[in-house]
Amino acid sequence: MLVKLTEVCGTGAVTTGRRYSLREVFVNPEHVVMVREEHQMKNLNEQGMLTEGLDKKHRFSKITIDKGTTGTEIIVIGDPNTVGTVLNKRNYVLKG
């Protein structure tokens, strides 16, 4: 089962000015090995440096996804508790 989250994507180089956009991403919860608070994105959002119209109260999480011998990290909207709840939500089909 895949879970839909909203990822914060950075484009551009640090020297020329970093720009950010949002996109939907589908994650397999069975491959997530860690979720932690991402304070830098929260600070950038409070300064108005992220996507226009994004609520300044949003919190962000960095998710580490297992890729076998390595991992990949993405930043998503939501505090670690909320993201963890979404990732652990299971839909079961009862057979009678």
What are these regions (language model features)?
Residues 1-96:
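Eukaryotic intrinsically disordered, low-complexity regulatory linkers and tails enriched in Ser/Thr/Pro
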